[in-house]
UniProtKB/Swiss-Prot annotation:
Signal peptide: none annotated. Pathway: One-carbon metabolism; tetrahydrofolate interconversion. GO terms for biological process: L-histidine biosynthetic process; methionine biosynthetic process; purine nucleotide biosynthetic process; tetrahydrofolate interconversion. InterPro entries: Aminoacid_DH-like_N_sf (IPR046346), NAD(P)-bd_dom_sf (IPR036291), THF_DH/CycHdrlase (IPR000672), THF_DH/CycHdrlase_cat_dom (IPR020630), THF_DH/CycHdrlase_CS (IPR020867), THF_DH/CycHdrlase_NAD-bd_dom (IPR020631). It comes from Actinobacillus pleuropneumoniae serotype 3 (strain JL03). This is Bifunctional protein FolD. The lineage of its organism: Bacteria, Pseudomonadati, Pseudomonadota, Gammaproteobacteria, Pasteurellales. NADP(+) binds at G166, A167, S168, S191, I232. Keywords: Amino-acid biosynthesis, Histidine biosynthesis, Hydrolase, Methionine biosynthesis, Multifunctional enzyme, NADP, One-carbon metabolism, Oxidoreductase, Purine biosynthesis.
Length: 285
């Protein structure tokens, strides 16, 4: 068996085309464009790449992007003041603060300072809580993107056993909630999990997000499983995932590549969340 490749690039292109079409329909009625404020603190090279990708997507689909590039020594109070100003700016529908932040800034405080209806990253406790209660509004972009990729396979997820490798706030925890919402039986593994290989070998769906290259071994994969690799690791100048790709591809029914799998979907779902926040904002005016 050789797995079908789930192209995040192709699915993301469809998602963004649909968003662009909806924005054109609004602007044709003399409505303003959606607005996304993107805040970058410091010059972390990986963060710059991610932020530029988000700004480029905004330009492509008709979202007005507002850039706030702040020096690395920016204080917490200064950043919170900018967020407070954007919270009250009617031309801004979404606020994104690129993580990680410099050590002098408390990321939790920053996340909670963004009003929930502009939290297009889906990190605010209010939005995470909505997902936990089965009434999601703005959803965490990477897990939301993973669900779109799973949807693209045409496989009915209800009743399948999903194993999430990694329990981070950004991927693992909201991912488990998304899979639960889709009717999966969910196991979450983490750094203290015993016999990880056994848990992975039981999975109909494996979602790996630990940030360790080739951490999930191909031999652990159950024949016919769906494998979603969230990891992006640079090794000897190449990008590789958290899953041992070639060995897993030989056993899986579907698999995402790295790059070109989950990465493009994270940006696409950020655009989707921005459109959703914009639509809610328009209705409230």
């Amino acid at each position: 068996m050789t797995a079908h490749i789930i192209s995040g690039t192709a699915v993301a292109k469809q998602v963004k085309a649909n968003i662009a079409e909806q924005i054109q329909a609004y602007t044709a009625q003399d409505k303003r464009k959606p607005g996304l404020a993107v805040i970058l603190v410091g010059m972390d090279p990986a963060s710059q790449v991610y932020v530029n990708s988000k700004r480029k997507s905004c330009a492509e689909i008709g979202i007005e992007s507002k850039s706030y590039d702040l020096p690395a020594e920016t204080g917490e109070a200064e950043l919170l003041a900018i967020i407070e100003q954007l919270n009250h700016d009617d031309s801004v529908d979404g606020i994104l603060v690129q993580l990680p932040l410099p050590k002098q800034i408390d990321a939790t405080k920053v996340t909670e300072a963004i009003v929930p209806h502009k939290d297009v990253d889906g990190f605010h406790p209010y939005n995470v809580g909505r997902l936990c209660q089965k009434i999601p509004t703005l959803r965490s972009c990477t897990p939301y993107g993973v669900m779109k990729l799973l949807e693209s396979t045409g496989v009915n997820l209800a009743g399948l056993h999903a194993v999430v490798v990694g329990a981070s706030n950004i991927v693992g925890r909201p991912m488990a909630m998304e899979l639960l919402l889709a009717g999966c039986t969910v196991t979450v593994t983490h750094s203290r999990t015993k016999d990880l290989a056994y848990h992975v070998s039981q999975a109909d769906i494996v979602v790996a997000g630990v940030g360790k290259p080739n951490f999930v071994k191909g031999e652990w994969i159950k024949p016919g499983a769906i494998v979603i690799d969230v990891g992006i690791n640079r090794v000897e100048g190449k990008l590789i995932g958290d899953v041992e790709y070639s060995a897993a591809e030989a056993k899986a029914s579907f698999i995402t590549p790295v790059p070109g799998g989950v990465g493009p979907m994270t940006v696409a779902m950020l655009m989707q969340n921005t459109l959703q926040a914009y639509q809610v904002h328009l209705q409230a005016v």
